[in-house]
Amino acid sequence: MDFLNHNYLSARASYDYTFNFWNDYLGLSTLVTKNSKHSVPQNPNSITESLKATLGLDDSPPCPCVMGEGDSGGHLDSCCCPPPASISILDLKERFSILSPFQNQNQGSLLSSSQEREIGIGGGFAGFDLFGVERKMRKPAARNKQEPKICVFCRNNGAPEEVYGSHVLKTPDGRVVCPILRAYTCPLCSANGDNAHTIKYCPLSKDQPAQRVLKGGRAVGGKRVKIF
């Protein structure tokens, strides 16, 4: 340890080991300078030049004949260089369409959709409205849900499921089809068959005084008729 400390102190006397932030210890500045000399300078107008090349615009220097005769006032008819090719409006539109590739697709999709609406798709499916058919299919389904497939009259009178599940009370046009209700004759209007109904639904029952029904189901002043 004494030997190492002695060498370190003797070397420190001849060289200052203090770290300097601004000193380039690795020589990076020399390396960067060499790379910058060998690298190709970038053109600041590279985007502009590529755009001109895409559009086919000529940015070449003028003809030397024009430069030589421009100051002398000579005629330009004797120029030896070929005249530049004329660019039409259609060519410019076609070249500018490269910059907006989605514009033509949108126009084509709008045109195709309008043509499909006019002439239809597939000939036989012309004017085929899928959503309209789906709505028409939903309406009967909803209507069928509202109409029970059982006889409410028989179920309310305590008939077994085999009986009230075998038929319905009425048809959609209001005709009574329940065999038990068809055999019943209304005591007020004597209606039966297709127009059969109970006293509760009889048109003449509005003129009769309402009977108070007890808990057992027997009306005051009357007897309960047990069908089942």
From Swiss-Prot:
GO molecular-function terms, A-Z: mRNA binding; translation repressor activity; zinc ion binding
Keyword line: Cytoplasm, Metal-binding, Repressor, RNA-binding, Translation regulation, Zinc, Zinc-finger
One cellular-component annotation, GO: cytoplasm
Short motif (C2HC 1): ranges: 151-178
Signal peptide: none
Name listed for the protein in its UniProt record: Nanos homolog 1
Region described as Essential for its translational repressor activity: 19-34
Zinc finger (Nanos-type): 150-204
Pfam families: zf-nanos (PF05741)
InterPro entries given in the database record: Nanos/Xcar2, Nanos_sf, Znf_nanos-typ
Protein source organism: Danio rerio (Zebrafish)
